[in-house]
Amino acid sequence: MAAPHHLMPLPREDPVSWLTTSGTAGGSFAPTEAAAYFFDRLASMSVGLDSGFRRISTTSARLAVPRVLSDAVANWTAEGTEITPTDPNADVVTAVPRKLAALTYASNELVDDSQPDAQDVLATNLARAVALKLDWSFFEGSGTAPEIRGLKNQSGIQTLSMGANGAALTNLDPFADALGMLAEEDAEGTAIVMHPRNWRALTKIKETSGSAKPVLVDGAGAPTEGPRRSIQGVPVWLTSQLSTTETQGSATTANSIYVYQADQVCAVIRADADVKVDKSAAFSSDRTAVRVTLRADEVLPNPAAVVRILGVLPA
């Protein structure tokens, strides 16, 4: 699994000093360091970003990402003869970053009287809210404005069905099939993302009937990393943001698992997270407002580098 980001320590002066600079109420109170720190924390909490999505930063409202549909062809050529030219078939996919926002209020008593850890609580709360919604959007987003389009609704990805009415995981065959499907498209499986209930079911599968030895176990990992999970050497990430109410035939409690080459999934970020504080918005209730906005989109330059295993039922 990719190593987690090393978080920059918070300043330890005034409880919200990381959010405040000189200026008038309603202006931008977040220095560049605070926005960068916030995005680092967000990235470490987002399964999509942490799994290795290729991050592309832009300052434009739209970004064209090249996509090769078929490669140029090489041929053995006799000495002195013309080389037959071939051109790759290519087009572009256009990313249109859309706004994801979170807003929270803190009482001025909390801001004024709490220990310095209050700033850490606010930062963590907002980062977690944005990261969870970002992950939901990366995998489940409909593409209907203002939502971005997630992997589930991207055209051109590969699919592997667990059957007409779905099925629970009883072995690792679906993952072997998914990794094989990627290899057949000259892609490499570098990440597997599933709902926690799927991993729970997998860890209960035993090597043989009557055996108590599980097929999969969590690796210990370093204390700062948490458990290491993998299937056939491919890192596994868990997120609760995958739907568990998909319909597969007569089943209505299915979910999907995604196996992909992470650098073929592009997270396009329109500038950094923007953090603002305003003491006037909730003047009548004596509270301070903290707002975070982020503009992002997701595009696939090679959709075949993603396999969706659909129709996975609870064990």
Spell out what each predicted region is.
Residues A282-A315:
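Hydrophobic, glycine-enriched assembly/anchoring segments
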Residues A2-A102, E147, N171, A305:
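Assembly/oligomerization interface modules of large self-assembling protein complexes
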Residues V73-T77, T86, D113-Q115, A201-K204, ...:
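Short helix/loop capping segments that flank catalytic or ligand/cofactor-binding pockets
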Residues E82-E184, R308-A315:
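Alpha-helical scaffold segments that mediate packing/assembly in large oligomeric complexes
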Residues A118-A123, I205-T208, G249-S250, A282, ...:
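Composition- and surface-driven signal marking solvent-exposed, interaction-prone regions
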Residues T59, A64, T144-S284, T288, ...:
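Extended oligomerization regions of viral-like shell subunits
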Residues L69-A74, A101, L110, L132, ...:
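Short loop/turn segments at secondary-structure transitions that flank enzyme active sites
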Residues R67, L100-A106, L238, V292:
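Short amphipathic
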